[in-house]
Design a protein with these regions (language model features):
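Bacterial N-terminal signal peptides that target proteins for export
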Residues: 2-15
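Cleavable N-terminal signal peptides
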Residues: 16-17, 27
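Short, glycine-/small- and polar/acidic-enriched structural segments
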Residues: 31-172, 176-180, 199, 207
Length: 332
């Protein structure tokens, strides 16, 4: 055999090997997913950052990019435009989107409890003890939790003032209570040495889920395995973050949001565990991330009752349990 023939065969063999290598690489390539949060990085987003930092997404065959939300970020718009594959959502937002005919769907709930609550001075006994108080409510709250609180306890719009995310009015007046998240405003009060109480609305019957995973109906239809792996890995991330070593996620959180301190992150993790937002309720037995039709129906009923949603909205289009019903990943 001539040397030219041998060289030709060698080149052919190398080309074939290269082609096989490319095919194998393509087969093993991780699926890319862009996840958009609802705000700046914080402990309340820790499960997703943990799944990224600890390699849980990678083990699931996913290359996940986490993008922070913020006050000027329209998450739903970015999701529908294809700039994000999954976003951190909210039940009211999703049901309103369904009413508008938008192709979105909730695939899991990180938290069994929405994180919205009320911060009050330490003499206040509970959410039923606000009749003589001034209640600070931000604009979005007037079309979500405030109608529920107002009806449940007989409060009035005359009690409310605008919440501008400035805590000074609260600090200066013991007759003021205000909307709050468990690890944000109470932490700032703690830094001031001011004793406060925090009342989570979910513990008083407010029905929406918290920190949900929302995607498009197209992704669920065309890439269900990607959705399934993303949900499972994210839930494993939450279990690891809240019950294990959170330091991998915390490093990423601080890299994305340098204003977030170790102290505030630790305070946030402590409060999330104390309030059992991820592993309480149905999640105790059915697993973190679980959703039920009954809970979604309760949110739909609330919105319709308060005139926030048309009664003919097909609320069942707002969620699917196919990715969470059989996982049963508990914290125990």
């Amino acid at each position: 055999m001539s040397r030219f023939r041998i060289a030709g065969l060698a080149r052919t063999g190398l080309a074939a090997a290269a082609a096989l290598s490319l095919i194998a690489g393509a087969a093993n390539a991780a699926d890319q997913v862009t996840f958009l949060t609802s705000w700046y990085a914080q402990a309340e987003h820790g499960g997703f950052y943990q799944a990224k930092a600890a390699g849980i997404y990678e083990k699931a065959g996913l290359d996940v990019t986490i993008k922070m939300g913020g006050p000027q970020v329209n998450g739903m718009q970015l999701l529908l435009a294809g700039e994000a594959d999954v976003m951190m959502g909210y039940d009211f937002q999703v049901l309103n989107s369904i009413a508008k005919g938008l192709p979105v769907i909730t695939i899991a709930a990180s938290f069994q409890k929405d994180l919205q609550g009320i911060m009050a001075h330490d003499h206040v006994k509970g959410l039923d003890d606000l009749k003589d108080k001034t209640i600070l409510v931000a604009t979005p709250g007037r079309t979500s939790w405030w109608p529920w609180l107002r009806r449940k306890y007989g409060y009035s719009d005359a009690q409310t003032q605008a919440y501008t995310f400035n805590l000074q009015p609260f600090f200066n007046d013991k007759n003021i209570v205000q909307q709050s998240y468990p690890s944000s405003e109470p932490f700032q009060a703690l830094q001031k040495g001011l004793p406060v109480k925090f009342f989570l609305m979910a513990d008083y019957g407010y029905p929406p889920y918290g920190t949900t995973m929302v995607t498009t109906t197209k992704l669920v239809a065309e890439r269900p395995d990607v959705a399934r792996r993303f949900v499972r890995a994210s839930i494993e991330g939450w279990k690891s973050y809240l019950k294990g070593d959170p330091s991998p996620a915390n490093a990423l959180i601080k890299a994305d949001n340098p204003k977030m301190s170790d102290e505030q992150i630790a305070f946030g993790i402590k409060r999330l565990n104390e309030l059992e937002v991820a592993d309480g309720g149905d999640a105790k037995t059915l697993g973190i991330g679980v959703m039920t039709e009954a809970r979604w129906k309760a949110t739909y009923d609330l919105m319709v009752q308060e005139g926030l949603l048309a009664a003919d909205t097909d609320w069942k289009k707002g969620f699917t349990t196919q990715f969470v019903k059989d996982l049963k990943i508990t914290s125990r």
